[in-house]
Amino acid sequence: MTTRYIFVTGGVVSSLGKGIAAASLAAILEARGLNVTIMKLDPYINVDPGTMSPTQHGEVFVTEDGAETDLDLGHYERFIRTKMNRRNNFTTGRIYEEVLRKERRGDYLGATIQVIPHITNAIKEKVLAGGEGHDVAIVEIGGTVGDIESLPFLESIRQLGVELGRDRTLFMHLTLVPFLGAAGEVKTKPTQHSVKELRSIGIAPDVLICRGDRAIPANERAKISLFCNVEERAVISLKDVDSIYKIPALLRSQGLDDLVVKRFGLECREADLSEWENVIYQEANPNGEVVIGMVGKYIELPDAYKSVNEALKHAGLKNRVSVTIKYIDSQTVEAKGDEVLQGLDGILVPGGFGERGVEGKILAAKFARENKLPYFGICLGMQVALIEFARNVAGMTDAHSTEFNKETPFPVVGLITEWVDEEGNVEQRHEASDLGGTMRLGAQLCHLLEGSKAAQAYKGNSCIERHRHRYEVNNKYRERLEQAGMVFSGLSSDRKLVEMIELKDHPWFVAGQFHPEFTSTPRDGHPLFEGFIAAASAHQKRDLK
């Protein structure tokens, strides 16, 4: 199969939405029957985002094969059916690590290792490998044109443009076209300078995606076309919209997919965007609203919980309600108590690391349990629910996780002592082990207890979900917790590890050690999130009565 490559760059400012634009184009091409994948090339020196602060970088998205990747890969999976893997995201740090490892082995036969050709060749190899087996591979280059960090990636795609030829490569550049209120007009000069910068390193864009808070007038598009040496039909206006799921239709209406298909000489059907039209209709026509309290520690940056936010919205679509997320700092719960938890239709405690704010999450789980309020715990959210239950129901005073209190008399949650590395080798781990890449990661089979809420949600006796954690339920206390009324509704493939818990005599109190948000999509939703929002809606209706 001959793969075509679309390289996506960004200029003027960061955070223009390259990932959303790339995913939206991929969605249209997929709707035309093409097999599409997307890659993200990140220019930072970290090997992966696994140890980066969520308040700086946003969430870490975990793929099926256990790669810790950029949150943009979450956008990719929500827009297209293709599942991402570790080949779909790599960083400058990863490239340098692999090149230096080869140098130490002597693979370069004593050559002087340089950015060109050694680093650029390694980048090109990864891009070509990531695109194998697909009709089209869209490659997003992180950062902004002009940044020194991005230069090796830009040089690599420039070389690929020459090596593969125009019939297999296309360069798409996102840029900002701001509106100046004082002048009453949009300004094209930033775009002209951004394209000039791109051309100075040997890349001539074939398509310009012009971002702004309004549609760009025809005369300004003609001006951009003239000064940037791009066909006028390839100057695409991408205005701000109230839903990212409207963007595929917006790009389709301007013929972006036709331009791509014609450029690559592909024979394919017209795009069928009916599924996206249905999503947009559901989003615009809810029959009610529910308020979900998300109790976390990274709430100053909502992108730290990007996939959870989106999964809640998807579940709202399936239940025909709009979901309002109330972000609650778990430290505020510690300071003010349950007064900040009033007026909610459900509580969700997402994943997290570190001791800060953990007691607030435990209090949130207690409030939900005692007040019969729907509760959904994810990863750490399951662990705090179990700790709360152990302390206040099972009689294990001061029960805790050894992550937060190594001297606890009841370590109901403890460190996983074995893990499997990328090569499949089993290694022993202890408290002093490296933090990066040393977690239980990726898709795992989970057996579900017959008759449980989990089994009802999944409509079966098993599920496959993605993990990212170092700590597990301590099996020593399982029997005692079960006797107190806790239900272990999900177990690992060997039935040795607890994957899900529920509470008896509660409308909906469900928690999982895994991260179901990573597999939720706007078209399909996710059974656990759907069940949670359905329970929240039912709770609200009971309160209204």
UniProtKB/Swiss-Prot annotation:
It is an enzyme of class 6 (ligase). It catalyses: UTP + L-glutamine + ATP + H2O = CTP + L-glutamate + ADP + phosphate + 2 H(+); L-glutamine + H2O = L-glutamate + NH4(+); UTP + NH4(+) + ATP = CTP + ADP + phosphate + 2 H(+). InterPro entries: Class_I_gatase-like, CTP_synthase, CTP_synthase_N, GATASE, GATase1_CTP_Synthase, P-loop_NTPase. One of its GO terms (cellular component) is cytosol. ATP binds at residues 15-20, 72, 239-241. Residues 291-542 form the Glutamine amidotransferase type-1 domain. One of its GO terms (molecular function) is CTP synthase activity. Its EC number is 6.3.4.2. Allosterically activated by GTP, when glutamine is the substrate; GTP has no effect on the reaction when ammonia is the substrate. The allosteric effector GTP functions by stabilizing the protein conformation that binds the tetrahedral intermediate(s) formed during glutamine hydrolysis. Inhibited by the product CTP, via allosteric rather than competitive inhibition. L-glutamine binds at residues 352, 380-383, 403, 470. Pfam families: CTP_synth_N, GATase. One of its GO terms (biological process) is 'de novo' CTP biosynthetic process. UTP binds at residues 14, 187-192, 223. Homotetramer. Catalyzes the ATP-dependent amination of UTP to CTP with either L-glutamine or ammonia as the source of nitrogen. Regulates intracellular CTP levels through interactions with the four ribonucleotide triphosphates. This is CTP synthase.
